[in-house]
Amino acid sequence: LIANSAIRHDWKWVIYSSENRTASVKMQLMQFAMDKKVADMTYAERKQAYKWVQGHFTIINNNQIYSYSDIILFMEKVMRQQPVDAIFVDPYNSLKLDMKGSGIGVHDYHYEAASEFLTFSKANDVAVWLNMHAVTEAQRRKGPDGLPVAPYAEDTEGGGKFVNRADCFMTIHRKVQAMDHDIRKLSELHVRKVREVETGGSPTPLEDPYCLQMNLSHTGFTNRLGQRAMFKPITFKESTQMPINMSFLS
């Protein structure tokens, strides 16, 4: 979805992923953009894809653990140097709790964090996307097939406060232990909340989410029937060396 917005709308992103190395995030973005494994790219393609990633994404190093206020401060510094359309925090649950001298509890701290992110988003016209884990109880819930079902919005760690503050809320669910290989490749996209439905968006039916199917190379997604890709991969013109004019020697 992040690569989709960058390719279709030229969005510029700031990404903090505490569970993935910076190089790994960049490599995955390169592969999604090109719809090709890095190992299958030519040197010129790798160079151009890396340049494209550098131009669209600022990746925050995960050598340190940051609080939500650290992320906002970093965003403000980046925005003074370049335009930013969105930030992705993966996951919010990994951010450290910085409650020294605040005199508030954990519940109020997280509500304050959600409010601060919302205020920052509105004030700067920047989309703030927080990736969050579900509570343990939701992970135990099984469907008729014996596999975990998609958690509800209120199953998010921290409860309904994040649902209440968010403009949009989505749940992405995969059945990675399904016996059917095709089902393993599916990602269910449940739109749980859309605040402004007047602009055209709306929640998905409870039992009828959008379904995206990962391709065989794990470098892109199509619709459930595999008929249409989410976006066309970017292409670069191979640079060719100009022929050397040796006529002056004759």
PLM segments and residue spans:
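Signature of the SF2 helicase/ATPase Hel1-core->accessory helical subdomain module
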Residues: S94, H133-T136
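Charged helix-capping and loop-helix junction motifs
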Residues: H107-S115, Y152-D155
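Walker A/P-loop NTP-binding motif
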Residues: L1-R8
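Structural recognition of the conserved hydrophobic beta-strand(s) that form the central parallel beta-sheet
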Residues: I15, F88-V89, V126-H133
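Conserved RecA-like P-loop NTPase ATPase core
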Residues: E19, I59, D90, F117, ...
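Short, hydrophobic alpha-helix immediately C-terminal to the catalytic nucleophile
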Residues: A3, S115-L118
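Conserved inter-motif catalytic segment of the P-loop NTP-binding fold
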Residues: H9-H107, E112
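C-terminal regions of RecA-like/P-loop NTPase motor modules
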Residues: Y68-D85, G101, T119-N124, E137-S250
